[in-house]
Amino acid sequence: IWQDWRWRVQRDGWRAAWPHIRKEALTLPYRRIKFVVVARSLAQSLPDARARASITVRPFAAGDLDFVRREYLPSEAHLCAQRLARGHNGIAACIAGQIVGYAWSCTDASLERVDLRFEPGDVLFTDAFTAPSARGQGVQTTLSEARLRAAQEQRHQRILAYIEVNNAPSLAVWRKKMNAEV
């Protein structure tokens, strides 16, 4: 967290960064992030992929870590680098050749250090992010559809995802567009 605070000060200046740092520092001892687990059988038909010609999907690459550092947080870039090294499957969404979002999946919950009951054929959909400038354009829906298709092609039977309870946009994508159960 210190690295993230230093980054905020360098990026935004002390005055702009201080309210964020103060809020995080005050809530840090009491932080209890709650997640919900979302499940979806891959035996169900996949959602209709609406043509989003402006969004392309490709594998996440080491060069994409600069985007994560710039748009999100340095600690998230470090986590993404660890995921690449551990063999997670990462994908990136691009508009006009520029990365605007990413998402991860893996077949071993211990790689993500979460306590989920995995069965043979399960795949875990983990972290996903969309740049603020691209939100509301269908980036996460496109990434989620791409992950579902890849999981189905790899003959997985079920996907699991854990999502923060306060992440309404992500929960809406999974409930409404991906037909997942919470």
Which positions does each model-derived feature cover?
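Short, surface-exposed acidic/glycine-rich loop or hinge patches that mediate macromolecular interfaces
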Residues: 62, 133, 164-165
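Conserved active-site alpha-helix within GNAT-family acetyltransferase domains
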Residues: 165-182
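Acyl-donor-binding surface of acyltransferase catalytic domains
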Residues: 1-63, 67-71, 76-79
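Conserved acetyl-CoA-binding loop-helix of GNAT-fold acetyltransferases
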Residues: 127-130, 136-153, 172, 176
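A conserved beta-strand-loop-helix scaffold within acyl/acetyltransferase catalytic domains
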Residues: 72-132, 145
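Conserved GNAT acetyl-CoA-binding A-motif
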Residues: 151-163
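Residue-level signal for beta-strand positions within conserved beta-sheet cores that form or flank
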Residues: 53, 121, 157
